[in-house]
Amino acid sequence: GVLQFSFIGYNTTEENIGGRTTINVTLNSGVINLGEVVAIGYGTQTRREITGSVANVDEASFNKGISRDASDLLRGKVAGLSITSGSADITQGSMIRLRGTSTLMNDQGPMIVIDGVPGGDMSSVAPSDIESISVLKDASSQAIYGSRAAGGVILITTKKGTGARTTVNYDGYVSMDVAANKPDMLNAAEWIAVNKELGNYETDAVQGIVNNYHADTDWFGEVLRTGFSQSHSVSLTGGSSTSNYRASYTYLDRKGVAKNNEIKRHSFRFQIQQRALNNRLRLTLDASGTLTDLSRPQGGDFIRAYNMIPLYPVYNADGTYFEGANGALYNEYDMGNPVHAMAENYDRTKQNIFTGRGEAQFDIIDGLNIKVDLFKSRSSYDQSVWNQATNYAGAGSNSNATRNNWSNDRELMEWTLNFDRTFGDHKVGALAGYSWENNEYASHYTYVENFAVTSMGADNIQTGNNLKVGNATSARNAYKLISFFGRATYSYKERYMVTATIRRDGSSKFGKNHKWGTFPSVSAAWGISQEPFMQNVKWVDDLKLRAGYGITGNQDGLSPYKSLELYESYGTYITGGSTQTAFRVSQNANPDLKWESTSMFNIGLDFSLFHGRLGGTIEYYAKKTKDMLYNYSVPTPTYVYNSIAANVGDMTNKGIELTLNWNVIKTRDFDWTTSLTLSHNENKVTRLSNDFYSTSAIYTGNPWIRGQSGQTSHIVEEGRSLGNFYNLKCLGLDADGHFIYEDVNNDKVISDDDRTYIGNALPKAEFGWTNNFTWKNWDFSFFIRGTIGNKVLNNPLAAYGTPNYIMGTNAMNNEYLTKIHESAKVSSFWIENGSFARLDNMTLGYTFDTKKIDWLSKARLYVTAQNLFVITGYKGLDPEVNYSSTSGLSPGIESREYFPKSRSFTFGVNLTF
């Protein structure tokens, strides 16, 4: 006979009786585990108890392969969470947005909270140290973090020690990266053929090149390479009945596909917890450190790779670097040997982050505890940039060097009192807290030219002889944040649940008339599946309707002294026969400066069906941001300075999100689980002006097309969304190869007055689709993600897709190269469909049976391929450009400085001893 075992939230398991009288069975959680403990602000709740919108991603669901930081683990896993990177520069982090952009200035995205400490840095946590990540998506769950939560909140929970036996884990991988794509530039024969077709071949300029240079150089092939990466992580966990500990060390060494693009990182983390007084007192100590060395090529190197003519060689006949006759290329527009520059110049950074945290928690009585957290961190950044006089980057200045240093010290103290008791069918919870935070920042910047001694580069900056006024600066600032916060929760039989929170923040950043802000929220949930009338509906495990409303704030756009009148040095004057430094006002005071405020309504339906085999969430949200910060022009002498930062604008974001998890097949040996995330967001700017400060529109975005300086690509105005491309609409080419532009105002003259809306860079939808298969000891997974409905300005094609400068530079191989007979302008001609579907990750692994090996608990080998292919109609390097360049106001431009994205192949091993 066969026995079937089932329980709500767990997969059904069948066992053959086979004459046995005792059968031990372990049930695995379904795709939706209702008992899963999820981190929320200043606490945890089970998934069934949550009334707000919270998405949780555990280690088993993280993206596989190479990860720069925690954001790579989340990419495509949470509906409404957009994580993009325009370039393959491995030293740069990703741009993160949750439910759209909600500010006009300095959008930092979601606030990062690491082990309960707000304001963290994702790069300070090694991906192998992360246990789970929770994303607080609506204001009812975010409001507990007040004036810093309008962009969303991401809670990172690191792995902790256990009371079990001592365990050693090793995770390591090696990886090879190749450029997934590179610009299709003309080779030598094609460059000659195009110039012949255009009638340029007999000109002195072209003949001078053809007669003197005979190479066929692939300049992008010269500045790119095969990258190699390795990562090794070792952790030690253990403990006893009253204590536990975990210590870990991770080493990462990555070499990107662009030469000089490298990162080396050492990360360590240590945590110990001691319990005393019959477990009523719990003491925790955490310490972590991250030491990172970064190296990146300079953006100009890739511009030169676009420009350099393929007949030019990399080296002269004597082995020296080619730079034209007597360095003639130095005097030409954006020309020079990028291989030479990469060999001599550098941009190196040392970035260190150290943190320490102490926590004491005491149970006063059953259900009531008090906790104090003390936290200290220090971050430092030391950048050295050197450009040698013997290549184009330093020739005009006889070598130049930059040293840029900053440090940030942060202190945090938080007290919380937490009550959590159950009285029959009633569960009651309450939280009260106080937070004090101090931040101090110091920086120093020096730029020097004209070096007599170059052997030490930027490390011998005192040998420079041309330190100009304004090229040596230093600064120091500080700000404090004091907060009071609270939360109350109530649940009746997990059927009716209510949560209310409030936070009051006082920040030294705010103007003197608005030092304090209050941020409340309320949410409720109805556990429909817990109603008596649902008890006979056996295929429904959980059905919960949630709704919430809250207010959060954003102070990212405020520097510590933004509300004050500031002065800066401005030249010199002579008095009493001596020269003195002059000063002038550099910023108007605004005592009414305050936080941006975002209110959000959210309604969602959570469901789990068929014993956890099918589950998911569908949600609708509507959020409105008001009092958005922006720098407005003001008249002088009414004001001392010609601009002022003020809270004026309003913006809305509305959207729908869907998450589905389905355990399609579940047998003894084979399992198939599929997950889908889908999100749609609509953005609109509803106000930019008031009675005191006004602007008709914000023209922004640098299209960076040769001969088109001063042009903009985007517009921000009332009644429309962000991301609008705004310039000339091209109707095609005439018989002579000239662009035909729409005469919008019918004045028979094409000018800026004919600019119109020519596309939007924001996607209409984003999706992620994950599939996981297991068969006996084998596992296989693949992950596809993408966007629908967004446009991209193909800047490289606009810059190099016409023949206007081909006698002196290279051009891109495209169908219009010999058909266009005028310079490119910013227009719809260069705007393309940016929708795409990317096979982002594919992994095959095998877990060995280690039951007969006493000293080995787990052994798994795997291979992973990342960015295997992209399905898209976009003709540029990659359709996934940074959606939020220039603070989110001009997204969707592919830059000529972007590194090509890489395709990675990884071999890894996981061992547990």
Q: What is the predicted function of each stretch?
A:
Residues 746, 780-839:
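C-terminal beta-barrel architecture of Gram-negative outer-membrane proteins
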Residues 760-793:
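Glycine-rich, aromatic-lined ligand/substrate-binding cores of catalytic
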Residues 5, 112, 314-315, 421, ...:
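Short aromatic-centered micro-motifs
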Residues 200-214, 229-231, 301-340:
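Acidic, glycine-rich flexible loop segments
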Residues 1-285, 290, 355, 447, ...:
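Short, small/polar-rich motifs associated with maturation and membrane association
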Residues 169-214, 445-447, 646, 663-761, ...:
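Conserved small-residue
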Residues 62, 109, 115, 227-230, ...:
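Extracellular/periplasmic, surface-exposed regions of secreted and cell-surface proteins
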